[in-house]
């Protein structure tokens, strides 16, 4: 994968980062996630991250039915998340922050605490995912993936620039596809935790095929 010159090296990753628990929001290393931030505690979180050297925010999905929007209580979260560097920041006239996160590296949460301003800070372990910061030169059989992708996009009514898809590198293709497809939270988490590009591609194909199979009522005949 390609990293920005602004991304930290592995030994520059901090021992703790602010956590943004957002349902069904998946960030992968090399992906980009736009966010519209308006709750006071998360405005404070973004301000905290901007003041840090690495400008990192950890994206973690809630693992249960806890509503992270209605209460400051500690929500139930998946253990593994992905840290994104704030690469774009803009203030709006109505008091929102519009930001974009560039995925840098996955992490496991060790422990966390609630800050006085209402957002979470977690001590994190980066070591299991040190390879996220290396360039992945793995090969990928793209044709079966793109064939399933075309049928899945047609099913969902998605429009895309197929020329751009064809020109994207393997890592970018998998990151973008994993992030934009409307999978369930547990499926998105499986994609996040996949330990290789090949396994993530296999998972994506299985998930899209299952959606196609379900829509067809179990009839897999193609026309």
Where are these regions (language model features)?
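Core structural elements
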Residues: 165-183
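Positively charged
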Residues: 1-163, 186, 197-200, 206-223
